């Protein structure tokens, strides 16, 4: 999501901050006429447009911090003249104009020296990324060998037979070695589709909760909170506790400068990322021990499940939380919301890993004060498998891989598939990935065992301290992601043909609900209607097969 120039403040949102011409008009049309617009997109040549990292519909750059500098080491030795494995070949990779593309730029010279091949890098506006690649493969042109893709495009690409698996290259000693089993279970599941490996590990997205550690530890706040709510102020374990903490801090001076702060901040701009926040929040209201899979559709018949009692209650919770944030956040993209937290103006938020890394950079007002934890749970969930509410002895907490999880895929029409895999595998090596995760500003988030500190993993604290992390902040941050990605209960990841249309339908009706135009129940009922229309337009049987394959079902 960040801008491509490393001289600009880092944010994975920056590349889609601007939309021009026909695309801006298309978005305006979508916002004005959500139901018909969603239907109109289905059945066109591409149902999922380009998106930068976690934010498919555009966002703004973070402005209050500056990136640090940390360069990954060279891994592949230069080949000797006459023995270079891919002499004369050219690998063309399609990338977004974003900081998330910087790692590819960094290894260009190393790749060419190690292989004898040439690396051609094509960068386009993030909104054009998917369309450019899709047009190429749909017409069998083969202009691009690889694409840095969002994980939720994979269903579209596999269904069209537009990308190839790399299973036959993975074990070969001819290529840089990386270990897929070092990727934690949840993000690892996104690398394969239908039992075959397609995406080479790179970025590992998921949402966690951020809180002001200094505020929760303040004795005066602890005393006042207990007097008001009857229990100890602490890290929220449930969304009900999250609400209490947000309500308590709302309207207080959180920075000592006399300015009024807010209990929370969430990016809820219409047509942007609100559906991602809802998905993560809603997971423990729907997913649970007796219902580990049913969230989006019934895999037997592709009937939408989005208007279940659990989904409705979760949206009611989100709508209620809005009152504890700045009203302007209804028009904010992630960058704006992150800025607000980085400036010390909010006590709580939940979002992607970018924020934890950005909090350590120059300009942040909260470095050394940022607590991080897995998202809160709920005391009960509506088990769609049993059609009833279920309650356990402890809060039901669910992990997530919400976001883009950017990774390379190989085009079916690549003329140099082996050289292409060499490039992607080189970027996936432990030596490279360790630096990407530690520096943070490149938008490549942790998700592999060597990213995490003992006892969770094998990382060294010095790697993070050299990248300017506060030690307490980074220990919280990494452990929160380890728990999130290791949780056996996960929000099912939607990655089938038409994903963009489904998410856009949810997004637009969600905006109506948080804006007070319709009730949560009405918003999700309308979403379910759109989901059914989209499925019918694409084809129920084809969607059922794709959905089951995406879940690993036979």
Please annotate each region the language model reported:
Residues 45-85, 151-210, 277, 373, ...:
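Hinge/lid segment of periplasmic solute-binding proteins
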Residues 52-66, 70, 355-365, 378-505, ...:
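C-terminal lobe and pocket-closing loops
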Residues 124-132, 237-241, 329-343:
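Short helix-initiation/N-cap motifs at beta->coil->alpha
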Residues 241-247, 284-334, 371-380:
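Glycine-centered hinge/linker elements that transmit conformational signals in sensory
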């Amino acid at each position: 999501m960040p801008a491509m120039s490393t001289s600009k403040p880092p944010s994975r949102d920056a590349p889609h901050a601007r939309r021009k011409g026909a695309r801006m008009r298309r978005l305006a049309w979508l916002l004005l006429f959500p139901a018909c617009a969603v239907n109109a997109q289905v059945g066109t040549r591409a149902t999922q447009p380009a998106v930068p990292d976690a934010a498919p519909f555009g966002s703004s750059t973070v402005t209050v911090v500056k990136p640090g500098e940390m360069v990954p080491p060279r891994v592949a030795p230069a080949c000797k003249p006459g023995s270079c494995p891919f002499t004369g070949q050219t690998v063309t990779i399609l990338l977004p104009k974003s900081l998330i593309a910087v790692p590819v730029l960094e290894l260009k010279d190393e790749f060419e020296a190690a292989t004898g091949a040439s690396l051609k890098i094509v960068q386009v506006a993030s909104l054009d990324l998917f369309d450019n690649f899709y047009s190429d493969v749909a017409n069998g042109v083969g202009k691009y060998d690889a694409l840095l893709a969002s994980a939720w495009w994979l269903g579209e690409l596999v269904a069209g037979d537009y990308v190839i698996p790399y299973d036959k290259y993975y074990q070969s000693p001819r290529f840089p070695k990386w270990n897929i089993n070092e990727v934690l279970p949840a993000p690892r599941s996104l690398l394969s589709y239908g039992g075959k490996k397609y995406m080479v590990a790179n970025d590992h997205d998921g949402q966690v909760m951020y809180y002001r550690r200094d505020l929760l530890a303040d004795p005066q706040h602890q005393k006042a909170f207990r007097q008001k709510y009857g229990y100890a102020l602490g890290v929220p374990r449930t969304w009900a506790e999250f609400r209490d903490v947000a309500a308590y801090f709302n309207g207080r001076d959180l920075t000592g400068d006399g300015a009024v702060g807010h209990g929370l901040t969430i990016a809820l701009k219409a047509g942007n990322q609100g559906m991602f926040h809802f998905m993560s929040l809603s997971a423990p209201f729907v997913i649970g021990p007796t219902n580990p899979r049913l969230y989006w559709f019934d895999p037997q018949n592709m009937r939408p499940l989005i208007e279940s009692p659990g989904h409705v209650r979760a949206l009611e919770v989100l709508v209620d939380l809005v009152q504890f944030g700045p009203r302007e956040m209804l028009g904010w993209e992630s960058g704006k919301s992150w800025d607000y937290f980085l400036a010390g103006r909010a006590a709580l938020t939940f979002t992607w890993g970018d924020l934890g890394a950005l909090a350590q950079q120059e300009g942040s007002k909260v470095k050394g004060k940022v607590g991080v934890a897995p998202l809160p749970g709920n005391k009960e969930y509506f088990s769609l498998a049993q059609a009833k509410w279920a309650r356990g002895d402890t809060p039901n907490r669910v992990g997530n891989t919400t976001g883009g999880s950017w990774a390379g895929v190989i085009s079916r029409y690549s003329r140099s598939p082996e050289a292409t895999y060499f490039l992607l595998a080189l970027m996936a090596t432990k030596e490279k990935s360790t630096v990407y995760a530690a520096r943070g500003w490149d938008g490549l988030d942790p998700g592999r065992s060597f990213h995490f500190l003992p006892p969770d993993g094998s990382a060294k604290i010095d790697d993070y301290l050299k990248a300017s992390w506060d030690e307490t902040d980074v220990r919280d941050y990494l452990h929160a992601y380890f728990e999130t990605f290791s949780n056996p209960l996960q929000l099912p990841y939607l990655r089938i043909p038409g994903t963009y249309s489904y998410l856009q339908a949810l997004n637009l009706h969600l905006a109506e609900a948080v804006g007070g135009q319709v009730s949560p129940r009405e918003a999700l009922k309308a979403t379910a209607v759109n989901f059914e229309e989209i499925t019918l337009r694409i084809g129920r049987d084809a969607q059922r097969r794709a959905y089951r394959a995406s879940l690993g079902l036979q």
